[in-house]
């Protein structure tokens, strides 16, 4: 094996993007990443709430009325630090591996803004990046055997595979 990459869908896309941006050293950095309708940011107005709450918790879990002013401020700061760290568009740098993002413009679960932010950060840091936004398909399309061939992305499945194959051939 010459290269090892990561792939993730939805919250798994956040995990794959975390591996691509929060790695410890060059030996733990993937060589490329494939992100499919990924959760990227923890910003409340854009994130997927379930992923956010499972990863960093809710504000009410961090701060409440029973705290001293000092402890309230400390916890609120720690909460915001975690949100910043796990808003992966803020963690991209020139060493982030080449990335392809694939999603649908009508995703009603993970806002498209997640992928747009990550893609723009990749470009700003001169990281090789590709993004494919299909006009429909919603969220959660994929390759389950129960609806393969009749799911919401059927019309684009060939394009999806072509995009990934082209991306992989360039790595």
What does each of the following model-derived ranges do?
Residues 95, 100-103, 107:
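Short beta-strand/loop motif that positions the catalytic acidic residue
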Residues 47-48, 111-115:
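Residues at alpha-helix caps and immediate loop-helix transition turns in enzyme cores, especially N-
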Residues 1-3, 29-32, 96-99, 125-130:
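Loop/turn elements at helix/coil->beta-strand transitions in domains of secreted/extracellular proteins
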Residues 42, 106-110:
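Acidic catalytic loop of the alpha/beta-hydrolase fold
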Residues 39, 43-91, 97:
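Mobile cap/lid helix-loop segments that gate and shape the active-site cleft of serine hydrolases
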Residues 1-2, 110-111, 121:
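Serine-hydrolase-like catalytic core of hydrolytic proteins
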Residues 1-51:
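Primarily recognizes the serine-hydrolase "nucleophile elbow" in alpha/beta-hydrolase
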Residues 102, 113-171:
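C-terminal catalytic histidine-bearing segment of alpha/beta-hydrolase fold enzymes
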């Amino acid at each position: 094996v010459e290269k090892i990459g990561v792939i993730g869908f939805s919250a798994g896309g956040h995990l794959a993007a975390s591996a691509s941006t929060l790695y410890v050293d060059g030996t733990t950095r993937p060589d490329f990443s494939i992100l499919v309708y990924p959760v990227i940011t923890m910003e409340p107005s854009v994130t997927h709430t379930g992923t956010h709450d499972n990863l960093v918790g809710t504000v009410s879990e961090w701060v409440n009325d029973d705290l001293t002013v000092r402890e309230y401020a400390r916890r609120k700061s720690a909460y915001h630090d975690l949100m910043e760290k796990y808003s992966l568009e803020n963690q991209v740098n020139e060493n982030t591996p080449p990335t392809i993002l694939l999603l649908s413009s009508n995703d009603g679960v993970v806002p498209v803004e997640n992928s747009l932010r990550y893609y723009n950060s990749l470009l700003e840091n001169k990281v090789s990046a590709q993004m494919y936004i299909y006009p429909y398909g919603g969220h959660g399309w994929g390759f389950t055997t129960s609806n393969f061939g009749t799911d919401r992305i059927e019309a684009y499945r060939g394009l999806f595979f072509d995009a990934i194959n082209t991306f992989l051939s360039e790595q």
